[in-house]
């Protein structure tokens, strides 16, 4: 994999500082000092993480090589490429300067699941876009994502609107505070991609020829159920929640003894979100090889609820790759397995990592107890271990072949 030199690392940190300053100076009169301090902390944390050369998530045994060969899939990426070209054509010079980056730019790694009030983004937000630009942006997402993925994206944004209604903080919350950037030049043969980044919603989408990698991806939200307001009845991430519960409820006592890391869910357990590109994480729980055929199908169904956000047939290609490692796929659980339980689960194999976590409340303290995990706040993350988040393994192979 290519490493950043000291000059590149310094450039990243300076750029992050400029971004932090430029987005705070004009609005400091509106920012509470505590919020500004949080913003500085998140910006520094991202700069420090990005300053480390990318390795990828791996176990303590290190990176497994050769898992992600460049190959023909037979599935055209032309529709999403043309949609990206149409979106770029709507941007003026100033918008392009903050929304279009080189394919190997560290901007790929500059993302977070926290709100825009405490983590500044590059790119152009839906909030800033003209009507034509929004149409082009959504057309890009509709070509990249399945119908379910598009609806989940919209539903998470609607949840963000509910946070604004509950808290009245326009610096932090709003359904269009999501930023779009393009990486590389959309091409039939050369690598390119895009990133959508905002509160509880991050999509990194890499393309090389007809191969697609859509990780890291973060899907979350609070409140999970919108009871009142503009989008009353909006609900998110129930399939991911319920399928995980269905899988653990199928297990016998000897299996549960391996799966359950702790029966008590007392804190936030997610560990592989932002700034964790180089996380070392060993397998825990029950291996697929120790599950019966029905449980393996349930496990694949859980994984499919995440991978299915990717448009077919790219999703099916990804699922085929995951299925080849089903016996080496581990399932781990924290919490109870009763029907209304709060819990955390993790699915990990050489080619995928999924985390689901019921978290403590942040924006719904009006109705949820501080510090107590609730079904009303969900975080999920999907990663490609062993160096292929952001398609980095594919990119490295492509660049090596060019030389």
Model-assigned labels for residue ranges:
Residues 2-13:
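Bacterial N-terminal signal peptides that target proteins for export
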Residues 11-22:
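Bacterial N-terminal signal peptides
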Residues 28-90, 97-146, 150-403:
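A cross-kingdom marker for long, charged
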